[in-house]
Amino acid sequence: MADQRFYATGKRKTAVARVWLKPGSGSVTINKRTIEEYIDRETSKMVIYQPLVLTGTFGKLDVTVNVLGGGGSGQAGAIRHGISKALLEFNPEFREVLKRAGFLTRDSRVKERKKYGRRSARARFQYSKR
């Protein structure tokens, strides 16, 4: 077991993240770019680091991510979900702490479709009485 890697997929909205973990220096690579190059918002970086900080593996595992679809927030959520599931592969004892934090649950909220006869999913067209 010279090169042991732990794989998992994470999803959020329309984003899908494929995550690989391996013991290392703690570098995070997203779509062949560093996290600083790929993600602008500090809150998104914090979301991605949450499972690593919570389990005490921050700086001990190299994270490689391939993420497709969605926007910035959806991709960050998908990466967090994927990292959490990969951490379970790495160490099943993390299940309790990750489950309590809600990182293992797939957030099923997606955009509601627009309905015909309406301006958007719920909003009606503007009504003029006269």
From Swiss-Prot:
* UniProt keyword annotations, A-Z: Ribonucleoprotein, Ribosomal protein
**Does the UniProt entry include the keyword Ribosomal protein?**
yes
> Does the entry feature the keyword Metal-binding, yes or no?
no
Q: What SUPFAM superfamilies does its record include?
A: Ribosomal protein S5 domain 2-like
Family matches, as InterPro entries: Ribosomal_Su5_D2-typ_SF, Ribosomal_uS9, Ribosomal_uS9_bac/plastid, Ribosomal_uS9_CS, Ribsml_uS5_D2-typ_fold_subgr
Coiled coil spans? none
Q: Name any one Pfam family assigned in the record.
A: Ribosomal_S9
A GO molecular function held by the record:
RNA binding
Q: Cite a GO CC annotation.
A: cytosolic small ribosomal subunit
Q: What biological processes does GO assign it?
A: translation
Task: Please give the PANTHER family that the UniProt record associates with this protein.
Answer: RIBOSOMAL PROTEIN S9 (PTHR21569), SMALL RIBOSOMAL SUBUNIT PROTEIN US9M (PTHR21569:SF1)
Membership in a protein family = Belongs to the universal ribosomal protein uS9 family.
- What's this protein's name? Small ribosomal subunit protein uS9
Tell me what organism the protein belongs to: Syntrophobacter fumaroxidans (strain DSM 10017 / MPOB)
